[in-house]
Amino acid sequence: MAGLQQGCHPEGQDWTAPHWKTCRPCQGPRGLTVRHLRTVSSISVFSVVFWGVLLWADSLSLPAWARETFTLGVLGPWDCDPIFAQALPSMATQLAVDRVNQDASLLLGSQLDFKILPTGCDTPHALATFVAHRNTVAAFIGPVNPGYCPAAALLAQGWGKSLFSWACGAPEGGGALVPTLPSMADVLLSVMRHFGWARLAIVSSHQDIWVTTAQQLATAFRAHGLPIGLITSLGPGEKGATEVCKQLHSVHGLKIVVLCMHSALLGGLEQTVLLRCARKEGLTDGRLVFLPYDTLLFALPYRNRSYLVLDDDGPLQEAYDAVLTISLDTSPESHAFTATKMRGGTAANLGPEQVSPLFGTIYDAVILLAHALNHSEAHGTGLSGAHLGNHIRALDVAGFSQRIRIDGKGRRLPQYVILDTNGEGSQLVPTHILDVSTQQVQPLGTAVHFPGGSPPARDASCWFDPNTLCIRGVQPLGSLLTLTITCVLALVGGFLAYFIRLGLQQLRLLRGPHRILLTPQELTFLQRTPSRRRPHVDSGSESRSVVDGGSPQSVIQGSTRSVPAFLEHTNVALYQGEWVWLKKFEAGTAPDLRPSSLSLLRKMREMRHENVTAFLGLFVGPEVSAMVLEHCARGSLEDLLRNEDLRLDWTFKASLLLDLIRGLRYLHHRHFPHGRLKSRNCVVDTRFVLKITDHGYAEFLESHCSFRPQPAPEELLWTAPELLRGPRRPWGPGKATFKGDVFSLGIILQEVLTRDPPYCSWGLSAEEIIRKVASPPPLCRPLVSPDQGPLECIQLMQLCWEEAPDDRPSLDQIYTQFKSINQGKKTSVADSMLRMLEKYSQSLEGLVQERTEELELERRKTERLLSQMLPPSVAHALKMGTTVEPEYFDQVTIYFSDIVGFTTISALSEPIEVVGFLNDLYTMFDAVLDSHDVYKVETIGDAYMVASGLPRRNGNRHAAEIANMALEILSYAGNFRMRHAPDVPIRVRAGLHSGPCVAGVVGLTMPRYCLFGDTVNTASRMESTGLPYRIHVSRNTVQALLSLDEGYKIDVRGQTELKGKGLEETYWLTGKTGFCRSLPTPLSIQPGDPWQDHINQEIRTGFAKLARVG
């Protein structure tokens, strides 16, 4: 019959006995045949062939009905997986088609035929195959891959065709997609509900078909609200299985693992490796139950059946004790087999267990489609594959291994059986029956054998109740009262914790190592001697020197008693034996310690950095209050810069600036803008380390709105223009910003570089400068000459005072750039020198080694360059200082070539373009030389000279090497195009001559390896008298080539006038036997033709066209 003839090949090729051996559905990608997989299925090749031949012979005996043919396509990955191939879709479909065509009760009015459509394992290929057979079949059996089921259903609905698939789910009521089996998720859910297991993981094979199956299964389980702890796919080999086992170990409370892959009982290697790994990792000790997914799709034989794979593999047999196999139930004797045997269509000794399990699923799908088509024709719809799902109602017919029962809603109601092993035998024992119509699991009397003796613990029943919200296995309504009580207790505890914390904070202000409030008893106030320095304009930013010109010793000699009366006249004190500085508030102003103020003070107290003065506490007295700060004896940066007796070189300045940048960067990283940064607020300690002070002072005043007079214009010279233009506060300009600090840093950079006050070069008053800065244009900035510091530092300074705040760099950027300017020097000058000396002494040996390696590297580079310019032997002699003696070579072949029209091309091109195209051309030629035994002598302009047989003699191979090279160069030259003039061809001509010559080095400066002798002149004459795209060969070279008998193709040119030689017989080298590259076609030139003028005119025309296009 036609169906049998199309059973193996999708395009209708004959399937006869000889084709069976190479039929792709029966043979995997590695040549794995049914004989090699007899552990998976006991189908014998001989029985299958015998069965197929009998069916074919039987079909030939049927009369040929003159009826219309209804062709169905069987979709599946039959050609990419040996296990899928074992389903034998052609045999299964043929058996069902024969039954349908011979069933008198089915009045189809048409002849049922089929085509096998292999789709591959990946979803895109499968969908493409499906679309390609739109017009070749009337309905489809499949898809097997659920990944393209939605797309296939939509396309089939538009085409007016139906899909009968056991792997795709569909809404009730039929339509384009007709499921031949119930939802696999519902089947698994019924089993899980029976055993009380809700927490699951899904592990799939790496194949696209199984990954998609796992994803859709997870979606279905999530729709039921089940907790999925893991969805993953196996990697290659044991390593991938081990990784999955580790992931399963990490999932808490896991009960079941659904395995979306081929069953180990059917030869599934991935499931076998995974189960062995699970046993090795201790996952098969009873804590988990493994459920294979693929066995849900077919009836797995189990009656009087032993699986050799369990007998032959002890670890797998032990691991399979943790597996529950759910499969369609099978009857003792299939009606399909009974009918076939009665009519002699199969061997008498062939039983149902010898058929691959998916075989029966395909068979049942065809039977179901035939009955739907029969019902459709009976109701007058006609022979059509559309809406067949609407014609499957209340059906009860014999299937392959059990009866096919369809209820009134079109749902199939098969019976599933749960199979188990005891970990020792190789047989599957039925323990439960699942009735799909009631979704109830009934025991059969044999208990499930769980490893360890007991099943995994049951999960909360709320997971399976659709009317109950289940959160982590707990019903929220039952715990609502507990949650309410917990919240109330938490609120009460929170209030108690707040008040306790508030009390502890108040206590921490006065006690402990991190206390903030200091008492007069903790400070020793010292009377200051009269100052001989000029007073500072900013009373709140006084110099940090101990006595403004005195020393600590003079202060101690003046007074060592605690005299509170001196407090109004001093800014220094002793605290815990260390000097401290008092940053006083305005007279009569007592700070209000609000929560915001205390938070700011605690933040300041916690700040510790080498370049930020430490805040030690707050002193609140009856008349005077002050911040207690770390003391720096060398005064402010402004004092240091104004001291003309102190010499400051760049190293010193860079050290101070780097300290300033580090301190400000630290404040910004702590989200603490300064707001009042100036050279007076930068102090220097005895080690010449610069520290930033007065940080937080403005914020503290703002936190409790303390009054302070407006600062003088001289105090605003460091202020950013946007702050000057902003709303004024009672104590100064606008709120502190990070970008405002960057501007102030730029002004300090100008002070350090010039050692002059800000904007000193303008010669204007501070008030006028502030007005110009706040109201540009013109832009008013300090002027710094290039000789007052490194150019990079001046450029960085100018970036810092950009008008737009967003254009100014961040402190991280400033720090990185300044480190590069300062070459990574440390902050302290003395420390930097000591560290430098120590580093130098420690790294001297490494430095010597590094320089030695660099010298060796340069030596190698020099030798490599010398060897590229001269032969290795000559280069070695020159390097050793020995004389290079000229050498006579009795037989060499020399190659000359040039570019026809090069002079015209050079005249019409820019010099840089000429160099570029010559470099491209000669680079291509040089690449050809690498594969031949030749030596490149030189290139002069467009002339290219190569020789073979020197400096290394190669016997009589010199002519062949040059000839092969010349042919290859000519082949590449024919396709070469100039980058600046791609439409202008490059025509190369070459000349070859063989003979003796002398080679030697000429000169001491830029020595050259030169060739001398008449052979060189003759080769040059051969090139100059040649023609474009031609290889001009002398008689000597021709004789050398013919003596080698390598199949060179040589044409006689005739007598040619050679300068200094007269007329000589010359030849053209046109090819070689076995040379496969194409050669450019030479110009047809007759004697006396002005071919050079024609070529030059062609070049000019090409450049003119290029100029017009440009």
From Swiss-Prot:
InterPro entries: A/G_cyclase, A/G_cyclase_CS, ANF_lig-bd_rcpt, Cyclic_nucleotide_synthase, Kinase-like_dom_sf, Nucleotide_cyclase, Peripla_BP_I, Prot_kinase_dom. Coiled coil: none annotated. Disulfide bonds join C121-C149. One of its GO terms (cellular component) is plasma membrane. Residues 880-921 are annotated as: Interaction with NCALD. Residues 67-475 are extracellular. One of its GO terms (biological process) is olfactory behavior. It is an enzyme of class 4 (lyase). It catalyses: GTP = 3',5'-cyclic GMP + diphosphate. It holds the Pfam family PK_Tyr_Ser-Thr. Keywords: Cell membrane, Cell projection, cGMP biosynthesis, Disulfide bond, Glycoprotein, GTP-binding, Lyase, Membrane, Nucleotide-binding, Olfaction, Sensory transduction, Signal, Transmembrane, Transmembrane helix. Gene3D superfamilies: 3.40.50.2300, 6.10.250.780, Nucleotide cyclase, Transferase(Phosphotransferase) domain 1. In contrast to mouse, guanylin, a urine odorant, does not stimulate GUCY2D. Belongs to the adenylyl cyclase class-4/guanylyl cyclase family. This is Guanylate cyclase 2D. It comes from Rattus norvegicus (Rat).
